[in-house]
């Protein structure tokens, strides 16, 4: 996987193009790789297959050729025009690896059958062989891991709730703007006159990618307005890349259903942000004091110019999180401020 880490080099990243939606299969993998390597001698390396299914990383010898390739949006012969061609940019959350202990399900179902069922429900996940103790490692996107979590929770509680017809109620995600989602929920609530009755004071817990949660908290005013409007208290626990949120009714159950209402709203916003946001990384290591001072000054000046970009300053690097175009331009301006060449 040495070539995969090569993309992390800033000088390589700017010459790298990401092509997603490619066909998966041994013969198809070979055809795709041969096709992209035959780009008039301009390709330095093709990383395919990669950790992400159907995603290829094309490293060109020159940045300009990579930019031209993106503009032309070339596709392999015979493929459907559903491929996504974009400049390499580290996603807010690329992939997650989790170790599961499925032994608790032995009394309900054969564990091998459970794994087969999970693979069918969430095909984007990669599963390791099932261990004799019932443990298995799983790797995939953050959203896929969260779907897996919900599937396992439903499997665990289903024997206790067979008589509850609404236990498995699902939400329809349609990619609406968060403010429109909230307005839609408010309209539904006003028509019904009240929320569906729930046990008073029942807290709700959800898990979010830390970068997405910080963006929601610091860049989205409606997040705080929603908590206040529905009288919901929020307790946060940040643990590296994952943040756990506990929501609880601040009025001791006087507004039944408000906690779940807020939880579903936050989950839908987080899903939208996961698809829309990108993270750019500016490495500070190796910079002199003058360069770092210029970076800090530029951060203050550019903050007002790019209000949709969240900046997290660390001792070794700066995270820029926001819409792809804004984060890229923000990073470009910071590099210029540090005296680094931007081509």
Swiss-Prot record:
GO terms for molecular function: RNA binding. Keywords: RNA-binding. InterPro entries: Nucleotide-bd_a/b_plait_sf, RBD_domain_sf, RRM_dom. It comes from the Eukaryota. Transmembrane segments: none annotated. Residues 15-90 form the RRM domain. PANTHER family: INTERFERON-INDUCED PROTEIN 35/NMI N-MYC/STAT INTERACTING PROTEIN, RNA-BINDING PROTEIN 43. This is RNA-binding protein 43. The lineage of its organism: Eukaryota, Metazoa, Chordata, Craniata, Vertebrata.
């Amino acid at each position: 996987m040495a070539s995969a880490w090569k993309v992390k080099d800033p000088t390589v990243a700017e010459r790298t193009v990401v092509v997603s939606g490619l066909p998966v299969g041994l013969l198809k993998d070979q055809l795709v790789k041969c096709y992209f390597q035959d780009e008039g001698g301009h390709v330095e390396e093709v990383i395919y297959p990669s950790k992400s299914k159907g995603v290829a990383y094309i490293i060109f010898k020159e940045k300009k050729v990579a930019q031209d390739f993106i503009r032309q949006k070339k596709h392999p012969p015979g493929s459907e025009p559903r491929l996504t061609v974009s400049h390499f940019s580290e996603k807010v959350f690329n992939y997650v690896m989790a170790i599961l202990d499925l032994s608790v399900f032995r009394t309900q179902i054969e564990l091998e059958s459970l794994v087969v069922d999970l693979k069918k429900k969430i095909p984007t996940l990669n599963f390791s062989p099932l261990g004799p103790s019932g443990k298995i490692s799983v790797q995939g996107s953050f959203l896929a891991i969260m779907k897996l979590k919900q599937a396992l929770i439903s499997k665990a509680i289903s024997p206790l709730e067979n008589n509850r017809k609404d236990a498995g109620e699902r939400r329809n995600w349609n990619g609406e703007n968060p403010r429109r989602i909230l307005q839609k929920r408010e309209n539904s609530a006003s028509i019904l006159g009240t929320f569906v009755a729930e046990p008073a004071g029942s807290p709700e817990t959800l898990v979010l990618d830390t970068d997405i949660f910080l963006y929601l908290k610091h860049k989205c005013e409606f997040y705080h307005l929603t908590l206040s409007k529905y009288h919901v208290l929020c307790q946060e626990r940040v643990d590296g890349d994952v943040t756990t949120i506990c929501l609880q009714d601040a009025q001791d159950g006087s507004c039944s259903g408000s906690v779940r209402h807020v939880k579903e709203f936050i989950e839908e916003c987080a899903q939208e942000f996961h698809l829309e946001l990108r993270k750019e990384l500016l490495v500070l290591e190796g910079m002199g004091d003058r360069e770092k001072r210029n970076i800090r000054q530029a951060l203050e000046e550019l903050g007002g110019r790019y209000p949709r970009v969240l900046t997290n300053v660390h001792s070794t690097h700066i995270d820029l999180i926001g819409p792809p175009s804004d984060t890229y331009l923000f990073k470009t301006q910071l590099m210029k401020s540090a005296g680094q060449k931007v081509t």
